[in-house]
A protein has these predicted regions:
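Secondary-structure transition/capping residues
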Residues: 25, 122-125, 161, 183-184, ...
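Structured interaction and signal-relay segments at domain junctions
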Residues: 11-73, 78-80
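Flexible, active-site-adjacent loop/turn segments at secondary-structure boundaries
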Residues: 37, 90, 180
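Juxtadomain coupling helices with adjacent low-complexity linkers
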Residues: 1-8, 15-17, 100-101, 106-166
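Residue-level recognition of short, structured coil/turn motifs
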Residues: 19, 155-158, 196, 211
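Sensory/regulatory domains in signal-transduction proteins
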Residues: 60-121
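Phosphate-/nucleic-acid-contacting segments
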Residues: 165-213
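Short, glycine/acidic-rich beta->alpha junctions
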Residues: 6, 84, 183
Length: 213
């Protein structure tokens, strides 16, 4: 997408300003499976060019409530090895449609001095509303994204995969569908693997969920 590519110089610009502890990522929504078109300091999250869209990116593509927001700041990201990141995202638009994102994810765990801790994120006194999600998972693959999403959902409900009944599995598929996960190629197979069920079962549950509207 040419509109997204116009932001390529901003990736270099932000890298020079923010330094090695901040990952800068440019996403193009025209190909969610390979949404990352440029990245600097990818070691922060373990990602690289050609990586898939995050759970937050999928939610933004899927959820109309983000259409009027220019950006979101002050939310938590989860990077490589489970490290906690301070994150911010600027939405790239064509007319009113969000076609990409420019994201900054800062690893505060490596900051040594008190002065260095006062990053540009400190300028935002509150999190942008509406809050996107509790934590954005910066996953390297579709399987990892789905595994994390399911694990977090089940943990919150005090469940595990082995104990799930059919209605529970339908709820999991409903959750994934609501977050736009099935926009990713191969997501059905990944969900089947994560839940220990067949792909036809996932398709059946997905059809049921989508019929519900």
């Amino acid at each position: 997408n040419e509109t997204v590519r116009r932001f390529l110089p901003m990736v270099d610009f932000l890298e020079q300003i923010l330094g090695k502890n901040s990952e800068i990522v440019l996403h193009d929504f025209s190909d969610p499976d390979h949404a990352i078109v440029d990245i600097r300091n990818g070691i922060v999250s373990g990602r690289k060019v050609g990586g898939p869209a995050t759970d937050l990116a999928l939610k933004i593509m899927h959820d109309a409530k983000y259409r009027d927001l220019p950006f979101i700041t002050g939310y938590e990201g989860r990077g490589a090895g489970g490290k906690t990141l301070e994150s911010a995202t600027y939405f790239i638009r064509e007319d009113k449609e969000i076609v990409g994102m420019l994201c900054v994810n800062t690893d505060l765990s490596t900051v040594r001095s008190i002065n260095a801790r006062h990053s540009l994120f400190d300028a935002a006194p509150t999190r942008t509303e509406p809050a996107p999600i509790e934590v954005e998972s910066l996953s390297e693959s579709t399987q990892e994204l789905i595994d994390r999403s399911i694990a977090e959902l089940l943990s919150a409900r005090g469940l595990d995969v082995a104990s799930l009944g059919q209605s529970d599995r339908v709820d999991v598929i409903r959750h994934l569908n609501g977050n736009g996960v099935f926009m990713l190629k191969g997501a059905v197979a990944c969900a089947a693997t994560a839940l220990g069920i067949s792909e036809p079962s996932v398709y059946r549950y997905l059809q049921k969920v989508r019929k519900e509207g």
